């Protein structure tokens, strides 16, 4: 397991490795990261510390009490989600997000104004994935500035 991006990185290649099949269940950035000409692929099946299937992209830092202290923006050409139960936590992905695996959602932490956000389009592989996403509670849906569609 690769742990380089779990504590937060400011390097696209490290983040990419953290979200690869050989990565970790969680990957994080430690400041705004601009990779607007690149596609970030999320691959593999992972479990969190509770043993539940999950994959997390943390776009924030927090204090010792787990209160979010700063949120960040990850700018990419495209974020391609191929890991089940992947979620964006407390920050913004600027670029299109393409969902090819079940369970995609967002997370808002305690003490955060706003929510996980996509400044771009949210594109699902098929209608079944979009329908499942639309059934989520509003606090698990990501705010999207563009269109939410099926490709």
Q: Where in this protein do the model-derived segments appear?
A:
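Short, charged/polar "capping" segments at the starts of alpha-helices
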Residues: 35-37, 128-134
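Detector for repetitive beta-architecture
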Residues: 24-26, 56, 71-90, 94-96, ...
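Charge-rich, low-hydrophobicity low-complexity segments
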Residues: 1-82, 149-151
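Localized chelating/binding microdomains
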Residues: 137
